[in-house]
Regions:
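Nucleotide-activated sugar donor-binding and catalytic core shared by glycosyltransferases
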Residues: 1-375
């Protein structure tokens, strides 16, 4: 019986890996699978060696670093001495997974990387580790394939998993009715992020901007997408200070808001790509710790951070970062989207091109077949 071990580090990787497992079981039901993962993989019947919930941290913190080193050694020992897989599938989470690959590549089993590190964005030298330690790379962006091929790395573009995961666009009137929104008003939805430090750094900025937007455009309403990782006690006191805006705080309604809003205020991340797939106009605004931004500026390889802009290699979506993340700039850019039809239509058309460029069906199916054929 063949054995596969999967390693993810946060929710998105867990979700993408679970989709692959679901397809693998159709092709190769006898395959024995264990993982470092979360609820999504567990729900597919995968035995978890450990839960990854404590791994998804950002920042330079010795406690985090030491815990990752210890966990990496523990996983490596388990793979070498106990589970002995035929293949290890690394999924996203480059900082941890690439370092682990340096150790486990010496053990003789195949190592495939699904959703590899974004070396085109920063720390391009990491491609040397990929070249040395990874047997095959499965990319989700078309431009990555050419980049890896130039380095002589075995690579295949499988498509972006979001294309299969994202629901069809819902009926806007139904969304408004079910969530207590006014059909006669424009909707601006706020996505302040899924991490505590993002809420602390961004939410007040976004709400102050919303207040300015409301003053200049009274026929606007606001909704806030609360991530499942953010507790009510963090959000509620902040929202209460903006009671004049009558903001609808919604949980588990991300796709409905992304699809039905007239404009979006987003923290940078995958949510921007999800919004692009719904062709919804947006701005990106992000402000993090100054020292982390300085480090990022030193190691970055590209000038853009928003995925739709990176994919098309042009400035489609406004990026308001660090010193440009101001109330004036956030509010004025949203007002321009709401009130300038020509600009709005231009952005919508550009977002359609993003969707077209990623269009290839069945990332999970393709990944599963490649694994099954090569394990």
């Amino acid at each position: 019986m063949k054995k596969l071990f999967i390693i993810t580090g946060e929710y998105s990787g867990d979700r993408h890996a679970a989709d692959v497992v679901r397809e693998l079981k159709k092709i190769n039901p006898e395959l024995e699978i264990e993982a470092v993962g979360g609820a999504c993989l567990a729900n597919e019947g995968v035995k978890l060696y450990c839960d990854h919930s404590k791994m998804s941290a950002i920042g330079f913190n010795w406690k985090i670093i030491l815990s990752h080193i210890f966990l990496g050694r523990t996983i490596a020992n388990y793979l070498k001495n106990e589970f002995k897989p035929d293949m290890v599938l690394l999924v996203d989470y480059g900082g941890f997974n690439l370092n682990l690959s340096k150790v486990i590549s010496k053990f003789g089993f195949k190592i495939y990387y699904y959703i590899p590190p974004q070396i085109w964005a920063s720390r391009k030298w990491r491609i040397n580790t990929v070249k040395k330690c990874i047997n095959k790379v499965l990319t989700i962006f078309p431009f990555e394939k050419e980049m890896y091929e130039k380095e002589g790395i075995d690579v295949e573009f499988v498509g972006h998993p979001l294309l299969a995961q994202i629901p069809e666009k819902p009926d806007k009137n139904t969304v408004f009715e079910e969530n207590g929104l006014d059909k006669d008003k424009k909707l601006v939805s706020i996505f302040p992020g899924s991490r505590v430090f993002e809420i602390k750094n961004l939410l007040t900025l976004f709400l102050d901007s919303a207040r300015v937007i409301k003053e200049k455009e009274p026929n606007v309403q606001f909704a806030l997408a609360q991530a499942p990782t953010i507790k009510d006690e963090l959000i509620k006191p902040i929202i209460e200070e903006y009671s004049d805006l009558d903001i609808k705080v919604l949980k588990n309604r991300n796709y409905e808001l992304l699809a039905s809003s007239d404009a979006l205020i987003l923290a940078s991340g995958t949510v921007a790509l999800e919004a692009a797939l719904y062709e919804t106009p947006m701005i990106i605004s992000y402000k993090g710790p100054a020292y982390l931004y300085m480090v990022y500026m030193l190691v970055r390889c590209i000038k853009r951070v928003c995925l739709p802009n990176i994919i098309m290699d042009e400035d489609i979506v406004p990026e308001l970062l660090q010193k440009n993340a101001t109330i004036d700039k956030v509010s004025s850019n949203i007002l321009y989207i709401l009130n300038n039809e020509s600009y709005r239509n231009s952005m919508v058309n550009s977002l359609k091109n993003v969707k077209q460029k990623l269009m290839t069906s069945g990332a999970a199916q393709k990944t599963a077949k490649i694994i099954s054929d090569n394990i």
